[in-house]
Amino acid sequence: MGKVYVFDHPLIQHKLTYIRNENTGTKDFRDLVDEVASLMAFEITRDLPLKEVEVKTPVQTATSKVISGKKLGIVPILRAGLGMVDGMLKLIPAAKVGHVGLYRDPETLKPVEYYVKLPSDVEEREFIVVDPMLATGGSAVEAINSLKKRGARNIRFMCLVAAPEGVEELQKHHSDVDIYIAALDEKLNEKGYIVPGLGDAGDRLYGTK
């Protein structure tokens, strides 16, 4: 079973408070999401393997370390997931970026794939699927389905806030995927919104309320 990691770093929690605040405007909201995504990327890459290399400093030759053999990919779920990409790329600029687009079928209410673009070397990469919210879990499950159908083998999921129902749904369908969360909230309400949550992340990122 994949593990669930909830980041309690003070900076993440501090910034998340302002992300939640309904009075935070679009620009500040976007900047804060970018910053938290960067901090979370620092945590999620903590276990990357290292190898020793020789480097010549201005003083002498030294043995130092670099990341070994890991090809990373970031896959935002459109559109809200885009708000997390730049913050992650600040720390891992060599990562390739794919995209998964989903829409909700008006009759079945289930997510339907409408766009997928991934790096050509899918099988060689470890992917981090990102979306600010993990509510019902339907979009995350379908996005990871899309990656696995195309050959992805190593996948993680990262979000700002999650409901227990969404975590359970994702674990039920993809028990091999680790989940990284800034905050695990109380529940979903009758409309499927995370409580207390942060509202509609896409609308708040792009000013389309």
From Swiss-Prot:
Catalytic activity: UMP + diphosphate = 5-phospho-alpha-D-ribose 1-diphosphate + uracil
Keywords: Allosteric enzyme, Glycosyltransferase, GTP-binding, Magnesium, Nucleotide-binding, Transferase
GO terms for biological process, alphabetical: UMP salvage; uracil salvage
UniProt entry tagged with the keyword Zinc-finger: no
GO molecular function: GTP binding; magnesium ion binding; uracil phosphoribosyltransferase activity
E.C. numbers: 2.4.2.9
CDD domains: PRTases_typeI
Chain positions recorded as 5-phospho-alpha-D-ribose 1-diphosphate binding sites: R79, R104, D131, P132, M133, L134, A135, T136, G137, G138, S139, D200
Recorded coiled-coil stretches: none
Annotated residues for binding of uracil: I194, G199, D200, A201
UniProt cross-references to Pfam families, sorted A to Z: UPRTase
Co-factor binding comment: Binds 1 Mg(2+) ion per subunit. The magnesium is bound as Mg-PRPP.
Regulation: Allosterically activated by GTP.
SUPFAM superfamilies: PRTase-like
Signal sequence region: none
Cofactor requirement: Mg(2+)
Enzyme kind, highest EC tier: transferase
Domain of life: Bacteria
Pathway in which the depicted protein is active: Pyrimidine metabolism; UMP biosynthesis via salvage pathway; UMP from uracil: step 1/1
Annotated function: Catalyzes the conversion of uracil and 5-phospho-alpha-D-ribose 1-diphosphate (PRPP) to UMP and diphosphate.
Family of this protein: Belongs to the UPRTase family.
NCBIfam families xref list: PRK00129.1, upp
Protein name: Uracil phosphoribosyltransferase
UniProt source species: Bacillus velezensis (strain DSM 23117 / BGSC 10A6 / LMG 26770 / FZB42) (Bacillus amyloliquefaciens subsp. plantarum)
